[in-house]
From Swiss-Prot:
It comes from Danio rerio. Residues 184-187 are annotated as: G4 motif. GO terms for biological process: cytoskeleton-dependent cytokinesis; protein localization. Gene3D superfamilies: P-loop containing nucleotide triphosphate hydrolases. Residues 49-56 are annotated as: G1 motif. The gene is sept8b. Residues 39-305 form the Septin-type G domain. The lineage of its organism: Eukaryota, Metazoa, Chordata, Craniata, Vertebrata. This is Septin-8-B.
């Protein structure tokens, strides 16, 4: 279907002009900052990892607070996602933080479909946002954006290679969410083994085509630090809710008989690198990548399923009006077909019901005739029994009369004999 022709005008070369005085639009950045601060920000983290691998502890350590935490058992029948939303404030900036935990992940004997509930949850958040966008009266200003901005994938510190479950899950998620792989409980592996493990993980991710989040290097302000941090992936982290006294200050650390592992000591683990990259440097980029890349991919696929597209078969631009008319025509045809199917189904159902009623009527009629014949036979039988009984009664009465007559005759004869004897 060809698009309606639209008049186009030649674009003149843009000219640069100098201002003769102050106008005021240099305050736009300040206005934007003020508006953003007043609205607040949202950030949604998905934590994927086995039960007991340290997801909750790391979240507490990252945001320097204690979140609600329910102990999860290892005996769940399947994987279910548990979102928790918190309101945080630092200086005058409000952050609505949502942490989504994958309860029961990796606990089943059959782990083949453990990734499905995670994929379904991410898609459901995209679908909710798309439905809000497509409303006639949208309220995106007040809409709570629950789309996942980052997936922290916790890798067990085996020191050998990635599990097949990890590879399959990350492969299913990499087109839907920004993934940062992290090695949990890194203090259980020696430094040399940890470095070999990092190289092995990255090699397996590349060979299996898993796309993880790369810190952006197109912004000169953060290009250098992001480029250097990309070389440190995956981050080997340690979480702790305990504070240990080192020298004259208290630090977050884990106390062992052989020594102390400091969470924020970069020679001990990559926790500081993760916090800097995730929160201080790239939080905005993670939000933008979620909207511009992952959500747009989901939105495009959904709209194409609904019949919307940018060009037709001849690569001509498609107008929204033409798409609407075409979809409306398809809908009307489909509706008519469904109405005809429903009408035919109704007619067939009526015919079936009529046939069933006629069959029931025939069965009832046959039963009635049978009962009628049975009744007539019983009536004839009773009539015969009545006649036989009446005949027996008549015979009995006749015999009774005869017996009484005979008895009376015998009685009168006896009286005569008695009189004759007396005389």
């Amino acid at each position: 279907m060809a698009a309606t022709e639209v008049n186009t005008y030649p674009t003149e070369e843009m000219r640069s002009l100098s201002l003769s005085g102050h106008v005021g639009f240099d305050s736009l950045p300040d206005q934007l900052v003020s508006k953003s601060v007043s609205q607040g920000f949202s950030f949604n983290i998905l934590c994927v990892g086995e039960t007991g691998i340290g997801k909750s502890t790391l979240m507490n350590t990252l945001f320097n607070t204690t979140f609600e935490n329910e102990e999860a058992s290892h005996f769940h029948n399947g994987v279910h996602l548990r979102p928790r939303t918190y309101s945080l404030q630092e200086s005058n900036v409000d952050l609505q933080l949502t942490i989504v935990d994958t309860v029961g992940f990796g606990d089943q004997v059959n782990k083949e479909e453990s990734y499905k509930p995670i994929v379904d949850y991410i898609d459901a958040q995209f679908e909710n946002f798309l439905e809000e966008e497509l409303k006639i009266k949208r309220s995106l200003y007040n809409y709570h954006d629950s789309r996942i901005h980052i997936c922290l994938y916790f890798i067990a510190p085996t020191g050998h290679s990635l599990k097949s479950l990890d590879l399959v899950t990350m492969k299913k998620l990499d087109s839907k969410v920004n993934i940062i792989p992290i090695i949990a409980k890194a203090d259980t592996v020696s430094k040399s083994e940890l470095q070999k493990f990092k190289i092995k993980i990255m090699s397996e991710l590349v060979s299996n085509g898993v796309q993880i989040y790369q810190f952006p290097t197109d912004d000169e302000a953060v290009a250098e630090i992001n480029s250097s941090m990309n070389a440190h992936l995956p981050f080997a982290v340690i979480g702790s809710s305990e504070e240990v006294k080192i020298g004259n200050k208290m630090v977050r650390a884990r106390q062992y008989p052989w020594g102390v592992v400091q969470v924020e000591n970069e020679s001990h683990c990559d926790f500081v690198k993760l916090r800097e990259m995730l929160i201080r440097v790239n939080m905005l980029d993670l939000r933008e990548q979620t909207h511009a890349r992952h959500y747009e991919l989901y939105r495009r696929c959904k709209l194409e399923e609904m019949g919307f597209k940018d060009t037709d078969a001849d690569s001509e631009p498609f107008s929204l009006q033409e798409t609407y008319v075409a979809k409306r025509r398809e809908f009307i045809v489909e509706l008519q077909m469904k109405e005809e199917q429903m009408r035919q189904m109704f007619v067939n159902k009526v015919k079936e019901t009529e046939a069933e009623l006629k069959e029931k009527e025939r069965e009832l009629h046959e039963r009635f005739e049978m009962l009628k014949r049975t009744h007539q036979e019983e009536k004839r039988s009773l009539e015969e029994m009545r006649r036989d009984f009446e005949e027996e009664m008549n015979t009995f009465n006749r015999r009774k009369v005869a017996a009484e007559t005979l008895q009376s005759l015998q009685g009168s004869t006896g009286l005569k004999k008695d009189k004759e004897k007396k005389t």
